[in-house]
Regions:
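Non-transmembrane, interaction-prone segments in cytosolic or luminal domains
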Residues: 1-5, 9-11, 17, 21-27, ...
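N-terminal [4Fe-4S]-dependent radical SAM core
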Residues: 1-29, 33-80
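Acidic carboxylate-rich catalytic motifs and surrounding loops in phosphoryl-/glycosyl-chemistry enzymes
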Residues: 121, 183, 242-256
Length: 256
């Protein structure tokens, strides 16, 4: 893999459900077509020139050294560290990235700081063996069970079945788990049952739900506001009954 260095690693994120975050890889082989906001920003600021370049991840080789310097200074300000907002810590098929991510989790935990992990890859079984923080939480992005949809919009990511299996294994090994259910598709993109999707991951501790933005197909669906209000109600009732913590992202629910 190609490698580069950076001058800093930890930063405070403006994402509404985030705190601090790190992105120890540049690029992502999953090649999401929602479109990918991270890829758009990388192009805008000159880090990449094309989609094809984004698909070739570059590892930040001095990430652990930067954390050694930054964590002691920032420790008292950090509630948790999210991995990651502009890349994937367990990118499908990249063992070198997986190994670094596991080392980073252990490093952050050694400062008694929990991590919040999110992937479209497969959560490794070795997570149960690394240094644990009781507030660590491990998650997958899951907006459908339809593999045709996944192949269209998340072409390089792991299958939905494999993601759920790895998440279930984390749960069964006593780890906290969560789901990022965004961007959730409108029926003109993917006709599906939200309840069926929720039942498949009813064991999780936390769900983030959000509408699909920045896509002409969504805006072309004439009842998109009504649809997302209805889906928000369904997921709210489901989570209340199952005692699952829920965050519905700003802008998902529309006021009449």
């Amino acid at each position: 893999m190609k490698k580069i260095t950076r001058k800093s690693m930890l930063y405070k994120t403006g994402v509404e459900y985030g705190d601090y975050t790190i992105n120890h890889v540049q690029g992502c082989s999953h090649g999401c077509m929602f479109p990918c906001y991270a890829m758009q920003m990388a192009k805008r600021f000159g880090k990449i020139k094309s989609y094809e370049e984004w698909l070739e991840p570059i590892i930040i080789e001095n990430a652990l050294e930067l954390l050694d310097a930054e964590l002691p200074k920032q420790k008292k300000n950090i509630k948790f560290v999210h991995m990651c907002f502009t890349t994937d810590p367990f990118m499908y098929g990249f063992k070198e990235i997986e190994d670094m991510s596991l080392s980073i989790i252990s490093k952050i935990n050694s400062f008694d700081i929990p991590v919040e992990v999110l992937t479209k890859g497969i959560l490794p079984t070795s997570l149960k063996d690394i240094l644990k923080n009781k507030n660590n939480i491990f998650g997958i992005t899951l907006v459908s069970l339809n593999e045709d949809f996944r192949k269209r919009f998340e072409p390089g990511a792991s299958s939905y079945a494999d993601r759920i299996k790895s998440l279930r294994e984390c749960h069964d090994n006593g780890l906290k788990t969560w789901i990022s259910m965004e961007p959730y598709p409108t029926p003109n993109i993917c006709e599906q049952s939200l309840i069926e999707l929720l039942e498949a991951i009813s064991f999780v501790d936390y769900i983030v739900f959000g509408r699909w933005n920045y896509n002409k197909l969504v805006s072309a669906y004439k009842d998109d506001k009504k649809f997302y209000n209805e889906q928000a109600s369904i997921i709210s009732n489901f989570c209340k009954k199952r005692k699952i913590r829920l965050h519905i992202k700003d802008g998902t629910i529309s006021e009449d």
